[in-house]
């Protein structure tokens, strides 16, 4: 799982310092990131849809068909004038990332290229329909996107999850949906030019990882600012997981809400209007 990418760490630590902590071993960083996510998940899992929030962020690949709300970042090696690039290649120039619409070599020009965005810019896939909401009233024929599928409402309902087999009379079976491979992130009809992760959570996960990295190097001499950042992260996780007012984390909540409704029979009452 890669919930973080290198740019997240560079907000808080220089690359040279990060390499000192990891010994330039990215496997250590990946392992401790999993540990940090597991720790955060233990606080949040009862209240938030952590399975969704902690999905990967990966470098965009034209060969991959991405599902709704999946996130990617732009990355490519710098263009080298002595190389010959095939059509469909991705290159970087002056911190911009380009998609080549024809083969290219020689001095850099923007001819036969499509600008995708800035190096490391994050995008997420737009869903084909609105995301299902437990508090919305749906009528016959309404379509929603939920957990990588498109569902059609068969009977008026509210609060009935489309992917719950008990609700088969209210929703169709659902059709898997994903974006056509090769759809460029610059296509604003298909992609959002935005990072849909909780930025607070990203910061706190980074703080937890840096704490574990420092502990690995010198367990008896962890910098006080690293300890404080770790403690702040844990305190925030505890507050976000609690029911007390004060912190509303920007993380998708579990739907339907626990205790959202109590059934006194096997079939919920319809919401009828006349």
PLM-predicted stretches and their roles:
Residues 23, 27-31, 85, 220, ...:
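Soluble non-cytosolic domains of exported or imported proteins
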Residues 166:
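Trihelical helix-turn-helix/Myb-like DNA-binding core that engages the DNA major groove
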Residues 191, 207-274:
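Short loop/turn elements at secondary-structure junctions
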Residues 200-208:
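Core structural elements
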Residues 1-81, 101-110, 115-135, 139-140, ...:
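Conserved short "hinge" loops at termini or chain/domain junctions
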